[in-house]
């Protein structure tokens, strides 16, 4: 089983145009993501998946590899599906989907999600990461997706609302979703063909499509947060974190 990590990156963003190329401590954000991912053990290859020549040129300038995907990709999953077809991966190969706006991703978290598939072959089709919320401001922030899972760490639901809701107490752990996915090439192909889910459409969360159609998502709880860069204001926060990392 080969393990390929893909970093989907698009230039257009309503809140932050050109986000992948935003400089953080003298490097474009996409370079931070790529270089931190490359520290993870167990990866056979890493590619940035993009349809933009500016991103392609930036990645190749620091020695990274790029796969050029269709500009018509409607979602991140469609871009991943396009990339794995172009790369000619085998059905059983493992694909890691790491968002291009996570410059603080810890390589150990990537290794953790790979090990799930190695330790539990054939038990599930998709895996992702969670992190226990420590900043209480994130609890009711819809930009931080919350998650609940069963006793075997299979996902039950993802929501932009706080879940679970403590009727009589606020003293309980709440977990947020970290945007890293792992799945086989075969599953990505099948997932991309599924119609839009009702809950997926309401919450605007692609992973809900898998749950709505009866697929298991295994959860690994990471010891490391991986905050996403959503606005220009987030850049300064990343610079401060990277300075002491």
Swiss-Prot record:
Domain of life: Bacteria
Cellular location(s): Cytoplasm
CDD domains on file: CMP-KDO-Synthetase
E.C. code: 2.7.7.90
GO cellular component term, pick one: cytosol
GO MF annotation list: 3-deoxy-manno-octulosonate cytidylyltransferase activity
Keywords: Cytoplasm, Lipopolysaccharide biosynthesis, Nucleotidyltransferase, Transferase
Keyword Nucleotidyltransferase: yes
Annotated metabolic or biological route of this protein: Bacterial outer membrane biogenesis; lipopolysaccharide biosynthesis
Entries under InterPro entries matching the protein: Cytidylyl_trans, KdsB, Nucleotide-diphossugar_trans
One example of a Gene Ontology biological process annotation: lipopolysaccharide biosynthetic process
Catalytic activity entry: 8-amino-3,8-dideoxy-alpha-D-manno-octulosonate + CTP = CMP-8-amino-3,8-dideoxy-alpha-D-manno-oct-2-ulosonate + diphosphate
Main location: cytoplasm
The keyword DNA-binding is annotated on this UniProt entry: no
HAMAP family: KdsB (MF_00057)
Role played: Activates KDO8N (a required 8-carbon sugar) for incorporation into bacterial lipopolysaccharide in the Shewanella genus.
Annotated family: Belongs to the KdsB family.
PANTHER family documented for this protein: 3-DEOXY-MANNO-OCTULOSONATE CYTIDYLYLTRANSFERASE, 3-DEOXY-MANNO-OCTULOSONATE CYTIDYLYLTRANSFERASE, MITOCHONDRIAL
Protein name listed in UniProt: 8-amino-3,8-dideoxy-manno-octulosonate cytidylyltransferase
Organism: Shewanella frigidimarina (strain NCIMB 400)
Gene name, Swiss-Prot/TrEMBL: kdsB
